[in-house]
């Protein structure tokens, strides 16, 4: 696949992510819930000032640092993707990197612009500027099962447990899926890449040997021609002298 096709995959992720966030922002209030699959899957509107899956970074300049880091990571991932495509890396790995890139860009858009255009910058602490301080919109909530730990269980007895409690978005899930597939199939991805590199190196070595062999034959042929020419030149004077006699 060409480089642009992997960026198209990332663009599709970005479009789905941003569309879902803007629809939730327009038609739902914060903390509203819509039950999709019983109690197992709900749309739950949350604003996340921090990282993926609701992880927060409570600091006046923490959000700015996080946004700058995300922007740097976004460009780094894009550069790495282009480099891996040119290197001929396994297609599955490149698709995973496209998913990660799409998710990274999706959350960068929230962090960079939503504070201004959706006016959702956090108010505690008050940011120095709304730019780069937008809160990420999360809405996917999968509380698959819940229970209360028995009192006799050490450390957690009597505590409420819910799986899966974090609320996230399409960008988060795209990054997570891309990373997990790479972790599970990295041996296959990089093994085939090494085979391709070895085959390319062997082909290059074979071509170099052919060129070297051709040059050697050409040099040998030219040397033979020079020797033959010199031999003919040596014979001509003797022929002339014999005719004079």
Model segments located where?
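Alpha-helical transmembrane bundles and membrane-interface segments of multipass inner-membrane proteins
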Residues: 1-245
